[in-house]
Amino acid sequence: MTQMNLEELEVTFTDWVPENSIIKVIGVGGGGCNAVDYMYNHRIQGCTFIVCNTDSQSLKKSHVPVKIQLGSGLGAGCNPTEGRNAALNSQQEIEEKVLNTKTDMLFITAGMGGGTGTGAAPVIAAMAKNKGILTVGVVTIPFKNEGNESMSKAIDGIYELQKNVDSILIINNEKIYTHYGSLLVHEAFPKTDEVLATAVQGITEIINKPGYVNVDFKDVKAMMTGSGMALMGCGKGEGENRIKDAVTGALASPLLNDCDIK
């Protein structure tokens, strides 16, 4: 699996329109929208991006062209019930822009522990499941300093999301914080966006780019349908020890959480 150098792909927004792909990526809530904005800004190919949020002011700041305002636009106040209700009230627009007949695979990315991502992501997943769309959740859980209440909400949200996704990849913000060393917490958030982007990009590249073993969408769907919890590591290497370095990097990847697969 190859990893593009995301830092070299800064984009001028007026000169790129992403393709209308069978693969959709939707960011739900503040954290999810930030991650999808990062993917869009870095020209990740092979998928179509959508952002949705209950906060209309935050939504306007996104560079992603396709936007869905959930509910009245006044935010969810860190209340997952508000996020859920806002998504339920916006089902028609979600169906039209996200779950149309051109969509075969959907990534739902969200930061769990707040109101919109925690409450709305499971609603969107259930809608996708009802349409037979291969659905993958890529979500984060909070930093320790965000408190027990946020973590409790995140766990409840992941439990609800798991009911309706084929596969879920959970990224631990705390591990990203420790993995990259002496970062301030606010400096770790862009790294979270990068890790989320790497996860989505890795899977879309398997489908869209030729490799040593030919894999198409049907192969990925057969493998991921109903597969449950997912693990993914990403590493790269150069020079004489490139294979060893890539494997070592993949095993140390923040995407693996605390799982020991050595």
Regions found by a protein language model. Give the residues of each.
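Tubulin/FtsZ superfamily GTPase core signature
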Residues: 1-262
